[in-house]
Protein backbone atom coordinates (compact mmCIF):
# COMPACT_ATOMS: atom_id res chain seq x y z
CA UNK A 1 0.00 0.00 0.00
CA UNK A 2 2.93 2.36 0.55
CA UNK A 3 6.38 2.93 -0.86
CA UNK A 4 7.92 4.92 1.99
CA UNK A 5 7.43 5.86 5.62
CA UNK A 6 6.74 9.56 6.15
CA UNK A 7 9.99 10.12 8.03
CA UNK A 8 12.05 8.68 5.17
CA UNK A 9 11.27 11.50 2.76
CA UNK A 10 14.02 14.02 1.95
CA UNK A 11 15.46 16.19 -0.83
CA UNK A 12 17.08 13.22 -2.60
CA UNK A 13 13.60 11.98 -3.54
CA UNK A 14 12.44 15.18 -5.26
CA UNK A 15 10.25 14.47 -8.32
CA UNK A 16 9.71 10.83 -7.30
CA UNK A 17 6.23 9.35 -6.99
CA UNK A 18 5.50 8.00 -3.51
CA UNK A 19 2.67 6.28 -1.67
CA UNK A 20 2.25 7.05 2.03
CA UNK A 21 -0.08 5.67 4.70
CA UNK A 22 -0.72 7.21 8.09
CA UNK A 23 -2.83 9.38 10.36
CA UNK A 24 -3.81 13.02 9.95
CA UNK A 25 -1.75 14.85 12.54
CA UNK A 26 -3.02 18.29 11.54
CA UNK A 27 -5.15 19.76 8.75
CA UNK A 28 -4.98 23.35 7.50
CA UNK A 29 -6.91 25.17 4.77
CA UNK A 30 -5.02 28.09 3.19
CA UNK A 31 -6.60 29.99 0.32
CA UNK A 32 -8.37 27.01 -1.15
CA UNK A 33 -5.35 24.70 -0.79
CA UNK A 34 -5.46 22.00 1.90
CA UNK A 35 -2.33 21.08 3.84
CA UNK A 36 -2.25 17.75 5.65
CA UNK A 37 0.46 16.72 8.10
CA UNK A 38 0.51 12.93 7.68
CA UNK A 39 2.03 10.96 10.55
CA UNK A 40 3.30 7.41 10.89
CA UNK A 41 5.77 5.77 13.27
CA UNK A 42 8.78 7.25 11.44
CA UNK A 43 7.75 10.90 11.32
CA UNK A 44 5.54 13.53 9.72
CA UNK A 45 5.32 14.63 6.09
CA UNK A 46 3.48 17.66 4.72
CA UNK A 47 0.98 16.86 1.98
CA UNK A 48 -0.45 19.56 -0.30
CA UNK A 49 -3.84 18.97 -1.94
CA UNK A 50 -5.12 21.55 -4.44
CA UNK A 51 -8.47 21.81 -6.23
CA UNK A 52 -6.94 20.63 -9.52
CA UNK A 53 -7.48 17.06 -8.25
CA UNK A 54 -11.19 17.25 -7.32
CA UNK A 55 -11.61 13.76 -5.85
CA UNK A 56 -8.44 13.99 -3.78
CA UNK A 57 -9.43 17.50 -2.68
CA UNK A 58 -12.88 16.34 -1.59
CA UNK A 59 -11.43 13.51 0.51
CA UNK A 60 -8.85 15.83 2.04
CA UNK A 61 -11.57 18.36 2.79
CA UNK A 62 -13.51 15.88 4.92
CA UNK A 63 -10.44 14.49 6.65
CA UNK A 64 -10.01 15.37 10.32
CA UNK A 65 -7.38 14.66 12.95
CA UNK A 66 -6.55 10.94 13.30
CA UNK A 67 -8.33 9.91 10.08
CA UNK A 68 -6.35 7.11 8.41
CA UNK A 69 -5.29 8.04 4.87
CA UNK A 70 -3.39 6.66 1.90
CA UNK A 71 -1.70 9.36 -0.17
CA UNK A 72 -0.17 9.07 -3.63
CA UNK A 73 1.76 12.00 -4.99
CA UNK A 74 5.00 13.59 -6.13
CA UNK A 75 7.72 14.95 -3.87
CA UNK A 76 8.78 18.54 -4.45
CA UNK A 77 10.85 21.13 -2.62
CA UNK A 78 8.85 23.49 -0.45
CA UNK A 79 8.68 27.07 -1.74
CA UNK A 80 11.35 29.37 -0.35
CA UNK A 81 10.26 30.89 2.95
CA UNK A 82 8.06 27.92 3.89
CA UNK A 83 10.85 25.46 4.62
CA UNK A 84 11.13 24.19 8.21
CA UNK A 85 14.70 23.43 9.30
CA UNK A 86 13.46 22.11 12.66
CA UNK A 87 11.55 19.28 11.00
CA UNK A 88 13.39 16.28 9.45
CA UNK A 89 11.13 16.43 6.38
CA UNK A 90 10.86 20.22 6.50
CA UNK A 91 12.56 20.89 3.16
CA UNK A 92 10.07 18.95 1.03
CA UNK A 93 6.35 18.28 0.64
CA UNK A 94 4.16 15.85 -1.25
CA UNK A 95 1.83 17.20 -3.95
CA UNK A 96 -1.06 14.76 -3.73
CA UNK A 97 -2.59 13.12 -6.78
CA UNK A 98 -4.82 10.78 -4.81
CA UNK A 99 -6.17 10.88 -1.25
CA UNK A 100 -7.92 7.73 -0.04
CA UNK A 101 -9.70 7.67 3.32
CA UNK A 102 -8.95 4.23 4.76
CA UNK A 103 -10.83 4.92 7.96
CA UNK A 104 -12.47 7.77 9.81
CA UNK A 105 -11.84 8.59 13.47
CA UNK A 106 -13.97 9.90 16.30
CA UNK A 107 -12.71 13.00 18.07
CA UNK A 108 -9.93 11.68 20.33
CA UNK A 109 -10.16 12.30 24.10
CA UNK A 110 -7.01 14.42 23.84
CA UNK A 111 -4.86 15.89 21.10
CA UNK A 112 -1.44 14.28 20.77
CA UNK A 113 0.40 17.59 21.08
CA UNK A 114 -1.58 18.52 24.21
CA UNK A 115 -0.83 15.37 26.23
CA UNK A 116 0.95 17.42 28.91
CA UNK A 117 -2.37 19.00 29.86
CA UNK A 118 -4.06 15.61 30.21
CA UNK A 119 -3.95 13.46 33.34
CA UNK A 120 -2.10 10.15 33.17
CA UNK A 121 -5.30 8.23 33.89
CA UNK A 122 -6.90 9.50 30.68
CA UNK A 123 -3.77 8.65 28.71
CA UNK A 124 -3.64 5.12 30.15
CA UNK A 125 -7.36 4.60 29.55
CA UNK A 126 -6.78 5.40 25.86
CA UNK A 127 -3.25 4.04 25.65
CA UNK A 128 -3.62 3.11 21.98
CA UNK A 129 -3.94 6.84 21.25
CA UNK A 130 -1.22 7.87 23.70
CA UNK A 131 1.17 5.46 21.97
CA UNK A 132 0.76 7.40 18.72
CA UNK A 133 2.76 10.27 20.21
CA UNK A 134 6.26 10.50 18.69
CA UNK A 135 7.77 10.57 22.20
CA UNK A 136 6.19 7.22 23.05
CA UNK A 137 7.16 5.71 19.70
CA UNK A 138 10.76 6.84 20.26
CA UNK A 139 10.89 5.21 23.71
CA UNK A 140 9.53 1.89 22.51
CA UNK A 141 11.79 1.98 19.46
CA UNK A 142 14.72 2.52 21.84
CA UNK A 143 13.53 -0.43 23.92
CA UNK A 144 13.53 -2.60 20.79
CA UNK A 145 17.06 -1.48 19.89
CA UNK A 146 18.25 -2.28 23.42
CA UNK A 147 16.89 -5.83 23.39
CA UNK A 148 18.28 -6.37 19.89
CA UNK A 149 21.74 -5.21 21.00
CA UNK A 150 21.64 -7.39 24.12
CA UNK A 151 20.57 -10.48 22.18
CA UNK A 152 23.26 -9.95 19.56
CA UNK A 153 25.96 -9.55 22.22
CA UNK A 154 24.96 -12.59 24.28
CA UNK A 155 24.51 -14.80 21.22
CA UNK A 156 28.00 -13.75 20.17
CA UNK A 157 29.31 -14.84 23.57
CA UNK A 158 27.85 -18.33 23.21
CA UNK A 159 24.71 -17.88 25.31
CA UNK A 160 21.58 -19.84 24.38
CA UNK A 161 18.14 -18.22 24.48
CA UNK A 162 16.07 -20.73 26.49
CA UNK A 163 12.53 -20.13 27.76
CA UNK A 164 11.57 -21.14 31.30
CA UNK A 165 8.03 -21.88 32.58
CA UNK A 166 5.49 -19.18 33.37
CA UNK A 167 3.26 -21.58 35.32
CA UNK A 168 5.31 -22.89 38.22
CA UNK A 169 4.94 -23.43 41.97
CA UNK A 170 4.99 -20.87 44.75
CA UNK A 171 8.37 -20.47 46.45
CA UNK A 172 9.29 -17.92 49.12
CA UNK A 173 11.35 -15.34 47.20
CA UNK A 174 10.48 -12.19 49.16
CA UNK A 175 7.38 -10.74 47.50
CA UNK A 176 3.87 -12.15 47.25
CA UNK A 177 3.18 -14.50 44.36
CA UNK A 178 0.48 -14.14 41.74
CA UNK A 179 -1.48 -17.39 42.01
CA UNK A 180 -3.26 -19.23 39.19
CA UNK A 181 -5.86 -21.86 40.15
CA UNK A 182 -5.60 -25.28 38.55
CA UNK A 183 -8.81 -26.72 37.12
CA UNK A 184 -7.39 -30.22 36.76
CA UNK A 185 -5.90 -30.27 40.28
CA UNK A 186 -8.77 -28.99 42.41
CA UNK A 187 -7.71 -26.80 45.32
CA UNK A 188 -4.15 -26.40 44.03
CA UNK A 189 -2.48 -23.39 42.46
CA UNK A 190 0.31 -22.47 40.12
CA UNK A 191 2.35 -19.34 40.77
CA UNK A 192 3.64 -16.90 38.19
CA UNK A 193 7.44 -16.65 38.47
CA UNK A 194 9.03 -13.79 40.38
CA UNK A 195 12.16 -14.62 38.40
CA UNK A 196 13.56 -17.58 36.42
CA UNK A 197 16.11 -18.11 39.23
CA UNK A 198 15.62 -21.78 40.03
CA UNK A 199 15.05 -22.88 36.45
CA UNK A 200 18.19 -21.19 35.18
CA UNK A 201 20.18 -22.88 37.94
CA UNK A 202 18.70 -26.20 36.87
CA UNK A 203 19.77 -25.44 33.30
CA UNK A 204 23.33 -25.12 34.60
CA UNK A 205 22.98 -28.48 36.36
CA UNK A 206 21.76 -29.81 32.99
CA UNK A 207 25.00 -28.74 31.33
CA UNK A 208 23.80 -25.91 29.08
CA UNK A 209 26.70 -23.78 30.37
CA UNK A 210 25.45 -20.39 29.14
CA UNK A 211 21.78 -19.31 29.22
CA UNK A 212 19.96 -16.04 28.68
CA UNK A 213 16.36 -14.94 28.35
CA UNK A 214 14.35 -11.73 28.04
CA UNK A 215 12.00 -12.91 30.76
CA UNK A 216 8.62 -11.75 32.06
CA UNK A 217 8.47 -11.73 35.86
CA UNK A 218 5.58 -11.13 38.27
CA UNK A 219 5.50 -9.80 41.84
CA UNK A 220 2.41 -8.87 43.81
CA UNK A 221 3.90 -6.02 45.81
CA UNK A 222 3.19 -2.41 46.65
CA UNK A 223 4.05 -0.28 43.64
CA UNK A 224 6.50 2.61 43.44
CA UNK A 225 7.67 4.80 40.59
CA UNK A 226 10.09 2.11 39.45
CA UNK A 227 7.95 -0.99 40.03
CA UNK A 228 5.26 -2.84 38.08
CA UNK A 229 3.42 -6.08 38.94
CA UNK A 230 4.73 -7.56 35.70
CA UNK A 231 8.16 -6.53 34.50
CA UNK A 232 10.92 -7.71 32.20
CA UNK A 233 14.40 -8.96 33.03
CA UNK A 234 17.48 -9.53 30.93
CA UNK A 235 18.36 -12.78 32.66
CA UNK A 236 21.59 -14.74 32.25
CA UNK A 237 23.52 -17.55 33.92
CA UNK A 238 26.83 -19.28 33.21
CA UNK A 239 28.72 -22.30 34.56
CA UNK A 240 32.33 -22.58 35.71
CA UNK A 241 32.59 -18.87 36.48
CA UNK A 242 33.64 -16.62 39.33
CA UNK A 243 32.41 -13.14 40.20
CA UNK A 244 34.97 -11.45 37.96
CA UNK A 245 33.81 -13.46 34.93
CA UNK A 246 30.17 -12.37 35.19
CA UNK A 247 31.07 -8.79 36.11
CA UNK A 248 33.51 -8.44 33.22
CA UNK A 249 31.07 -9.91 30.70
CA UNK A 250 28.05 -7.84 31.74
CA UNK A 251 30.08 -4.64 32.09
CA UNK A 252 31.31 -5.12 28.53
CA UNK A 253 27.74 -5.79 27.40
CA UNK A 254 26.43 -2.56 28.97
CA UNK A 255 29.36 -0.56 27.60
CA UNK A 256 28.67 -1.82 24.07
CA UNK A 257 24.94 -1.26 24.51
CA UNK A 258 25.43 2.42 25.41
CA UNK A 259 27.89 2.82 22.54
CA UNK A 260 25.57 1.14 20.01
CA UNK A 261 22.31 2.77 21.05
CA UNK A 262 23.26 6.17 22.52
CA UNK A 263 26.77 6.68 21.13
CA UNK A 264 27.91 7.14 24.74
CA UNK A 265 31.18 5.84 26.14
CA UNK A 266 30.62 5.03 29.80
CA UNK A 267 33.37 5.87 32.30
CA UNK A 268 35.14 3.26 34.42
CA UNK A 269 33.10 0.96 36.67
CA UNK A 270 34.74 1.22 40.11
CA UNK A 271 34.10 -1.52 42.69
CA UNK A 272 32.84 -0.47 46.10
CA UNK A 273 32.15 -2.70 49.12
CA UNK A 274 28.62 -2.55 50.49
CA UNK A 275 29.85 -1.26 53.86
CA UNK A 276 31.69 1.64 52.21
CA UNK A 277 28.67 2.55 50.10
CA UNK A 278 26.44 2.67 53.19
CA UNK A 279 28.96 4.66 55.26
CA UNK A 280 29.80 7.22 52.58
CA UNK A 281 26.48 7.53 50.77
CA UNK A 282 23.82 5.98 53.00
CA UNK A 283 22.76 3.70 50.14
CA UNK A 284 23.75 0.43 48.51
CA UNK A 285 23.08 2.04 45.12
CA UNK A 286 24.82 5.43 45.41
CA UNK A 287 24.56 8.09 42.75
CA UNK A 288 28.21 9.02 42.24
CA UNK A 289 27.31 12.03 40.11
CA UNK A 290 26.51 13.92 43.32
CA UNK A 291 29.66 15.14 45.14
CA UNK A 292 28.19 14.88 48.65
CA UNK A 293 29.26 12.31 51.24
CA UNK A 294 28.22 11.28 54.73
CA UNK A 295 31.00 11.70 57.30
CA UNK A 296 31.10 9.76 60.58
CA UNK A 297 31.33 11.99 63.65
CA UNK A 298 30.41 9.43 66.33
CA UNK A 299 33.71 9.82 68.18
CA UNK A 300 33.34 13.61 68.38
CA UNK A 301 29.75 13.48 69.62
CA UNK A 302 30.10 10.91 72.40
CA UNK A 303 31.10 13.55 74.96
CA UNK A 304 28.84 16.47 73.99
CA UNK A 305 26.14 17.64 76.39
CA UNK A 306 23.42 16.98 73.83
CA UNK A 307 21.73 13.60 74.23
CA UNK A 308 20.20 13.74 70.76
CA UNK A 309 23.78 13.28 69.49
CA UNK A 310 25.62 11.61 72.37
CA UNK A 311 23.03 8.84 72.77
CA UNK A 312 23.27 7.43 69.23
CA UNK A 313 27.03 8.08 69.21
CA UNK A 314 27.47 5.71 72.16
CA UNK A 315 24.92 3.09 71.06
CA UNK A 316 26.10 -0.09 69.35
CA UNK A 317 23.45 0.26 66.64
CA UNK A 318 23.59 4.06 66.49
CA UNK A 319 25.25 6.54 64.20
CA UNK A 320 25.87 10.27 64.02
CA UNK A 321 26.80 11.45 60.54
CA UNK A 322 27.34 14.83 58.93
CA UNK A 323 26.52 15.90 55.37
CA UNK A 324 28.29 19.06 54.20
CA UNK A 325 26.80 20.99 51.30
CA UNK A 326 29.19 23.43 49.66
CA UNK A 327 27.54 26.85 49.32
CA UNK A 328 24.46 25.62 51.16
CA UNK A 329 24.42 28.46 53.70
CA UNK A 330 22.19 30.35 51.26
CA UNK A 331 19.34 27.91 51.98
CA UNK A 332 16.44 29.68 53.68
CA UNK A 333 14.83 28.53 56.90
CA UNK A 334 11.75 27.59 54.86
CA UNK A 335 13.87 25.37 52.63
CA UNK A 336 15.58 23.77 55.63
CA UNK A 337 12.18 23.09 57.21
CA UNK A 338 11.09 21.41 53.97
CA UNK A 339 14.18 19.17 54.09
CA UNK A 340 13.36 18.38 57.72
CA UNK A 341 9.90 17.23 56.67
CA UNK A 342 11.52 15.20 53.91
CA UNK A 343 13.83 13.21 56.21
CA UNK A 344 10.89 12.57 58.54
CA UNK A 345 9.53 10.29 55.81
CA UNK A 346 12.52 8.00 56.43
CA UNK A 347 12.07 7.87 60.20
CA UNK A 348 14.36 10.74 61.21
CA UNK A 349 13.08 12.72 64.19
CA UNK A 350 14.60 15.96 62.96
CA UNK A 351 17.38 17.54 60.93
CA UNK A 352 20.03 19.47 62.85
CA UNK A 353 22.19 21.92 60.90
CA UNK A 354 25.03 24.42 61.14
CA UNK A 355 25.62 27.29 58.72
CA UNK A 356 29.25 28.34 58.33
CA UNK A 357 29.06 32.08 57.71
CA UNK A 358 32.60 33.14 58.71
CA UNK A 359 34.77 30.34 60.03
CA UNK A 360 37.63 32.63 61.08
CA UNK A 361 35.39 34.04 63.84
CA UNK A 362 35.09 30.63 65.49
CA UNK A 363 31.77 29.78 67.06
CA UNK A 364 30.61 33.36 66.56
CA UNK A 365 30.82 32.86 62.81
CA UNK A 366 28.43 29.91 62.89
CA UNK A 367 24.64 29.98 62.77
CA UNK A 368 22.78 27.12 64.43
CA UNK A 369 20.64 26.33 67.47
CA UNK A 370 22.99 23.45 68.41
CA UNK A 371 26.49 24.99 68.32
CA UNK A 372 26.27 25.92 72.01
CA UNK A 373 26.60 22.20 72.82
CA UNK A 374 29.72 21.78 70.70
CA UNK A 375 32.19 24.46 71.74
CA UNK A 376 34.86 21.91 72.67
CA UNK A 377 34.69 19.93 69.45
CA UNK A 378 33.52 22.45 66.86
CA UNK A 379 36.93 23.01 65.24
CA UNK A 380 37.54 19.27 64.99
CA UNK A 381 34.07 18.88 63.48
CA UNK A 382 34.61 21.59 60.88
CA UNK A 383 38.00 20.11 59.99
CA UNK A 384 36.50 16.61 59.74
CA UNK A 385 33.92 17.66 57.14
CA UNK A 386 36.15 20.21 55.39
CA UNK A 387 33.78 23.12 56.05
CA UNK A 388 34.41 26.54 54.53
CA UNK A 389 32.59 29.85 54.52
CA UNK A 390 29.20 29.59 52.86
CA UNK A 391 28.68 25.89 53.61
CA UNK A 392 25.90 24.21 55.56
CA UNK A 393 26.29 20.96 57.52
CA UNK A 394 23.30 18.68 58.08
CA UNK A 395 23.33 15.99 60.77
CA UNK A 396 21.62 12.66 61.28
CA UNK A 397 21.61 11.00 64.70
CA UNK A 398 19.64 7.81 65.33
CA UNK A 399 19.92 4.12 64.64
CA UNK A 400 22.43 3.61 61.83
CA UNK A 401 19.73 2.28 59.51
CA UNK A 402 17.58 5.40 59.92
CA UNK A 403 20.54 7.77 59.57
CA UNK A 404 21.68 6.04 56.39
CA UNK A 405 18.22 6.03 54.82
CA UNK A 406 17.40 9.63 55.80
CA UNK A 407 20.72 11.29 54.94
CA UNK A 408 21.15 9.05 51.89
CA UNK A 409 17.80 10.22 50.53
CA UNK A 410 18.55 13.84 51.52
CA UNK A 411 21.84 13.64 49.64
CA UNK A 412 20.02 12.63 46.45
CA UNK A 413 17.33 15.30 46.89
CA UNK A 414 19.93 18.02 47.45
CA UNK A 415 21.73 16.85 44.33
CA UNK A 416 18.52 17.20 42.33
CA UNK A 417 17.35 20.48 43.89
CA UNK A 418 20.72 22.24 43.68
CA UNK A 419 21.76 20.63 40.37
CA UNK A 420 25.01 19.29 41.80
CA UNK A 421 25.55 16.62 39.14
CA UNK A 422 29.17 16.47 37.97
CA UNK A 423 28.74 14.08 35.04
CA UNK A 424 26.07 12.49 32.85
CA UNK A 425 26.73 8.84 33.72
CA UNK A 426 28.30 7.32 36.83
CA UNK A 427 28.38 3.49 36.94
CA UNK A 428 29.83 1.28 39.65
CA UNK A 429 29.79 -2.22 41.09
CA UNK A 430 28.71 -2.74 44.70
CA UNK A 431 30.25 -5.92 46.14
CA UNK A 432 30.82 -7.75 49.43
CA UNK A 433 27.19 -7.66 50.53
CA UNK A 434 26.17 -9.28 53.81
CA UNK A 435 24.48 -12.64 53.32
CA UNK A 436 21.66 -11.65 55.66
CA UNK A 437 19.96 -8.67 57.23
CA UNK A 438 18.07 -8.76 60.52
CA UNK A 439 14.46 -7.64 60.75
CA UNK A 440 13.05 -5.69 63.71
CA UNK A 441 12.65 -8.95 65.63
CA UNK A 442 16.25 -9.99 65.04
CA UNK A 443 15.36 -12.72 62.57
CA UNK A 444 17.69 -13.08 59.61
CA UNK A 445 16.49 -12.71 56.02
CA UNK A 446 18.46 -13.14 52.81
CA UNK A 447 19.68 -9.75 51.56
CA UNK A 448 19.48 -10.98 47.95
CA UNK A 449 17.95 -14.47 47.79
CA UNK A 450 18.61 -17.77 49.58
CA UNK A 451 20.54 -19.27 46.65
CA UNK A 452 23.44 -16.80 46.87
CA UNK A 453 26.73 -18.39 47.89
CA UNK A 454 28.61 -17.09 50.95
CA UNK A 455 32.21 -15.99 50.44
CA UNK A 456 33.45 -18.13 53.34
CA UNK A 457 33.90 -21.86 53.92
CA UNK A 458 30.96 -23.98 55.09
CA UNK A 459 32.62 -24.30 58.51
CA UNK A 460 33.05 -20.53 58.90
CA UNK A 461 29.50 -19.93 57.70
CA UNK A 462 27.99 -22.31 60.23
CA UNK A 463 30.09 -20.78 63.02
CA UNK A 464 28.93 -17.18 62.37
CA UNK A 465 26.22 -16.92 59.70
CA UNK A 466 25.03 -13.46 60.81
CA UNK A 467 28.33 -11.87 59.79
CA UNK A 468 28.92 -13.86 56.61
CA UNK A 469 29.49 -11.96 53.39
CA UNK A 470 28.01 -13.11 50.10
CA UNK A 471 29.41 -13.55 46.61
CA UNK A 472 26.87 -11.05 45.29
CA UNK A 473 27.39 -8.03 43.06
CA UNK A 474 25.08 -5.23 41.92
CA UNK A 475 25.60 -2.98 38.91
CA UNK A 476 24.51 0.58 39.72
CA UNK A 477 24.10 3.49 37.32
CA UNK A 478 23.19 7.02 38.41
CA UNK A 479 21.75 5.79 41.69
CA UNK A 480 19.62 3.08 40.08
CA UNK A 481 20.30 -0.63 40.48
CA UNK A 482 20.54 -1.81 36.88
CA UNK A 483 21.12 -5.43 37.77
CA UNK A 484 21.99 -7.77 40.57
CA UNK A 485 23.62 -11.16 40.59
CA UNK A 486 25.77 -13.60 42.47
CA UNK A 487 27.66 -16.83 42.42
CA UNK A 488 25.12 -19.48 43.44
CA UNK A 489 25.29 -22.28 45.96
CA UNK A 490 26.05 -25.49 44.07
CA UNK A 491 26.47 -27.75 47.10
CA UNK A 492 23.43 -29.35 48.74
CA UNK A 493 24.91 -29.25 52.24
CA UNK A 494 25.59 -25.52 52.01
CA UNK A 495 22.13 -24.87 50.57
CA UNK A 496 20.50 -26.69 53.48
CA UNK A 497 22.66 -24.71 55.92
CA UNK A 498 21.45 -21.42 54.42
CA UNK A 499 17.84 -22.59 54.57
CA UNK A 500 18.35 -23.50 58.23
CA UNK A 501 19.64 -20.01 59.08
CA UNK A 502 16.55 -18.56 57.38
CA UNK A 503 14.27 -20.70 59.53
CA UNK A 504 13.39 -23.09 56.70
CA UNK A 505 13.52 -26.53 58.25
CA UNK A 506 14.47 -29.71 56.44
CA UNK A 507 10.86 -30.77 55.89
CA UNK A 508 9.79 -27.38 54.52
CA UNK A 509 12.92 -27.19 52.35
CA UNK A 510 12.16 -30.59 50.84
CA UNK A 511 8.54 -29.61 50.23
CA UNK A 512 9.28 -26.26 48.55
CA UNK A 513 12.74 -26.76 47.08
CA UNK A 514 13.08 -30.53 46.86
CA UNK A 515 13.60 -30.45 43.10
CA UNK A 516 16.55 -28.05 43.50
CA UNK A 517 18.08 -29.94 46.41
CA UNK A 518 17.79 -33.20 44.47
CA UNK A 519 19.44 -31.62 41.43
CA UNK A 520 22.38 -30.42 43.54
CA UNK A 521 23.17 -34.07 44.35
CA UNK A 522 23.86 -34.94 40.74
CA UNK A 523 27.02 -33.03 39.90
CA UNK A 524 26.01 -29.37 39.91
CA UNK A 525 28.79 -27.16 38.46
CA UNK A 526 29.91 -23.89 40.06
CA UNK A 527 27.71 -21.25 38.44
CA UNK A 528 26.54 -17.68 38.70
CA UNK A 529 24.66 -15.02 36.84
CA UNK A 530 22.93 -11.69 36.86
CA UNK A 531 19.57 -10.19 35.96
CA UNK A 532 19.06 -6.68 34.62
CA UNK A 533 15.78 -4.83 34.97
CA UNK A 534 15.02 -4.05 31.32
CA UNK A 535 12.34 -1.50 32.19
CA UNK A 536 14.68 0.45 34.46
CA UNK A 537 17.45 0.28 31.88
CA UNK A 538 15.21 1.71 29.16
CA UNK A 539 13.92 4.36 31.57
CA UNK A 540 17.47 5.55 32.29
CA UNK A 541 18.64 5.45 28.69
CA UNK A 542 15.56 7.29 27.40
CA UNK A 543 15.41 9.87 30.19
CA UNK A 544 11.86 8.82 31.09
CA UNK A 545 10.46 9.76 34.50
CA UNK A 546 8.90 6.38 35.29
CA UNK A 547 8.95 2.89 33.84
CA UNK A 548 5.29 3.34 32.85
CA UNK A 549 6.61 5.55 30.05
CA UNK A 550 8.73 2.76 28.56
CA UNK A 551 6.17 -0.09 28.75
CA UNK A 552 3.58 -0.29 25.98
CA UNK A 553 0.67 -1.24 28.24
CA UNK A 554 1.63 -0.64 31.89
CA UNK A 555 -0.40 -1.02 35.05
CA UNK A 556 -1.23 1.86 37.39
CA UNK A 557 0.15 2.37 40.89
CA UNK A 558 -2.72 0.18 42.12
CA UNK A 559 -1.79 -2.67 39.73
CA UNK A 560 -4.76 -2.10 37.42
CA UNK A 561 -5.04 -1.71 33.65
CA UNK A 562 -7.37 1.21 32.98
CA UNK A 563 -7.66 0.36 29.29
CA UNK A 564 -8.96 -3.21 29.71
CA UNK A 565 -10.39 -2.75 33.24
CA UNK A 566 -8.21 -5.60 34.48
CA UNK A 567 -8.39 -7.19 36.96
CA UNK A 568 -12.05 -8.01 36.50
CA UNK A 569 -14.69 -10.28 37.93
CA UNK A 570 -15.32 -13.73 36.50
CA UNK A 571 -18.56 -15.64 36.21
CA UNK A 572 -19.92 -18.01 38.83
CA UNK A 573 -19.61 -20.81 36.28
CA UNK A 574 -15.90 -20.18 35.85
CA UNK A 575 -15.35 -20.15 39.61
CA UNK A 576 -17.31 -23.36 40.04
CA UNK A 577 -15.24 -25.05 37.34
CA UNK A 578 -12.11 -24.04 39.26
CA UNK A 579 -13.57 -25.22 42.58
CA UNK A 580 -13.27 -21.71 44.01
CA UNK A 581 -15.78 -19.95 46.24
CA UNK A 582 -15.33 -16.26 46.96
CA UNK A 583 -15.86 -14.69 50.33
CA UNK A 584 -18.43 -11.89 50.23
CA UNK A 585 -16.90 -8.55 49.30
CA UNK A 586 -16.69 -5.90 51.98
CA UNK A 587 -19.62 -3.47 51.83
CA UNK A 588 -19.56 0.14 52.98
CA UNK A 589 -15.96 -0.21 54.15
CA UNK A 590 -16.98 -2.99 56.53
CA UNK A 591 -14.92 -6.05 57.33
CA UNK A 592 -14.78 -9.02 54.99
Swiss-Prot record:
GO terms for biological process: aspartyl-tRNA aminoacylation. CDD domains: AspRS_core, EcAspRS_like_N. L-aspartate binds at residues 173, 219, 448, 488. It catalyses: tRNA(Asx) + L-aspartate + ATP = L-aspartyl-tRNA(Asx) + AMP + diphosphate. One of its GO terms (cellular component) is cytoplasm. InterPro entries: Aa-tRNA-synt_II (IPR004364), aa-tRNA-synth_II (IPR006195), aa-tRNA-synth_II/BPL/LPL (IPR045864), Asp-tRNA-ligase_1 (IPR004524), Asp-tRNA-ligase_1_N (IPR047089), Asp/Asn-tRNA-synth_IIb (IPR002312), AspRS_core (IPR047090), GAD-like_sf (IPR004115). Its EC number is 6.1.1.23. Belongs to the class-II aminoacyl-tRNA synthetase family. Type 1 subfamily. PANTHER family: ASPARTATE--TRNA LIGASE, MITOCHONDRIAL, ASPARTYL/LYSYL-TRNA SYNTHETASE. This is Aspartate--tRNA(Asp/Asn) ligase. SUPFAM superfamilies: Class II aaRS and biotin synthetases (SSF55681), GAD domain-like (SSF55261), Nucleic acid-binding proteins (SSF50249). The keyword Ligase applies. Homodimer. The keyword Cytoplasm applies.
Amino acid sequence: MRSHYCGQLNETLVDEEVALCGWVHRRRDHGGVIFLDLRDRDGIAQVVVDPDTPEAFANADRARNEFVLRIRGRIRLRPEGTQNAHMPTGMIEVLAKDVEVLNTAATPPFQLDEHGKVGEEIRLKHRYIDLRRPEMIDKLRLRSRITHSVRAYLEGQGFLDIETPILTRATPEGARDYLVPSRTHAGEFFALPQSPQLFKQLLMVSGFDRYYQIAKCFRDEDLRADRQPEFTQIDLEASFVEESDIMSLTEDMIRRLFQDVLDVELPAFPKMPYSEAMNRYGSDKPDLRIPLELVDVDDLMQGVDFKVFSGPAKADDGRVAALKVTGGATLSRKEIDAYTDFVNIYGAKGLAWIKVNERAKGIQGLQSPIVKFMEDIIESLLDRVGAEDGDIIFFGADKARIVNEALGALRVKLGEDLDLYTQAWAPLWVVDFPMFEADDNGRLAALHHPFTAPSCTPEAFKADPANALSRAYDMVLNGTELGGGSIRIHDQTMQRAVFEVLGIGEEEADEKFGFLLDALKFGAPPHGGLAFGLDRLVMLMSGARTIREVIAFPKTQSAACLMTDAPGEVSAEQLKELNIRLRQKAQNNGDV
